[in-house]
Amino acid sequence: MTFSNLCNEIFWKSTTDYHVTDSVDAPMNNPYELKTIEYYLYLKNWIDAVQWHFEDIIRDPQIDPVEALALKRRIDKSNQDRTDLVELIDSYFLDKYKEVKPLSDATINTESPAWAIDRLSILALKIYHMQQEVERTDTTEEHRAQCQIGRAHV
């Protein structure tokens, strides 16, 4: 299994596990061994799922300003946790490939590996939510078709 396939498998599991309760306050039950890359990938996606739903909550035009401020602080902490975890995942790669010597003409073609993995995690959430929109029965056929097209392009 490639590393990206491992990521996708774990991200999908975390995404579907989160949506069992669909609550930003639900405790995470990470099935992977503590301090393994699998554990960190699951945690990464869980943080992203919670953050996704924090953003939904804060966009509510009827949100109480006091609740909004408290939520903003939770979002800030979540962002810091996310960044710290990305750095930890990058450390995993630095250690794993510490003996590899780059070629003299090597170029950097992306962000760090962990930020690329971050994009895969967000992509898993986008795919999940687009599929939810496709399956809704309380929307128009046009909306569902548009979401189906969007999901196919994600």
Where are these regions (language model features)?
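Helix-loop segments that flank and shape redox-cofactor active sites
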Residues: 55-71, 138-139
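Non-transmembrane amphipathic alpha-helical segments
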Residues: 44-59, 78, 85, 89, ...
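Leu/Val/Ala/Ile-rich N-terminal alpha-helices, chiefly Sec-type signal peptides and the beginnings
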Residues: 1-62
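Short, charged, amphipathic alpha-helical segments
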Residues: 68-77, 141-150
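Short, charge/polar-rich alpha-helical segments
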Residues: 30-43, 76, 104-120
